[in-house]
């Protein structure tokens, strides 16, 4: 598979992550969606996105939670729990 094909696959997975930020996103599930082993998926994701999968998901959840804090009347604890941040 060429780098461009890997890049396209990882972009599709990052879109999937964006749509499911409030859901559990285990590495194994994401790798399966990409059609890669966990190891290969983790390696390719980091190569394309320049961050580990876990760091990327955490960052995207933080950004979305911050937007929700600004633009909604939801309590901070409710937003934190929606985006899977624990106390």
Region roles according to the model:
Residues 1-5:
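Inter-domain helical "communication" segments and dimerization helices
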